[in-house]
Amino acid sequence: IGNSFWELEDDVTLKDSIDMDIIYRNMQDFEDMISSVVIDCVPWNGYTTCMWHNLITAKIVIDKNGKLSALQEKYRIPYPKKLKENIISNNLKLLSGMLPSFDMQIKKAENRGDLVSVNHRVAEFLASYFDIIFALNEMTHPGEKRMQSICSEECKILPNRFDENLNRLFAGMFRESISDVINDMIIEIKTITKM
């Protein structure tokens, strides 16, 4: 009760062992965040459409004034083309091709033997990588859980060797240089984005 690590929420387990998150959000802030993404097409560094996904897939239990239901209906719209383009453009730059891009940061961290930094940068690389894939498929981002299986099962556009490269990445982390795997992943995602 009263957890505020990420958002103000109560986390409970019901008698039938179902876990439930009860989240308390300022509706105006929530709408402004979603509007910035969906209407203004402002990309994030990974997870761009998570809150939009959260809104349109939420099971509304209590909505005394109907505002959440109205907001949900307002944003049940087709995926904006400009948003798709902006997410892909922004996150591709983060993957590779710039001095601070993740591929360079990962390589530097590996070279200095900084495993904590490797772990952190790979997580950020994957956040941008999956953001691109969901945007390419015009799917709202479902959040951090089961991303690989959701992509494998539901995405029509995937990089070649999608599962193979992810499995290689995780199998090789902290045991060998993963820069080659990261490079292969970048090549394949650039191939399908044609950028």
Predicted regions, residues:
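Conserved nucleotidyltransferase catalytic core and NTase-mimicking acidic/glycine-rich helix/loop elements
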Residues: 67-195
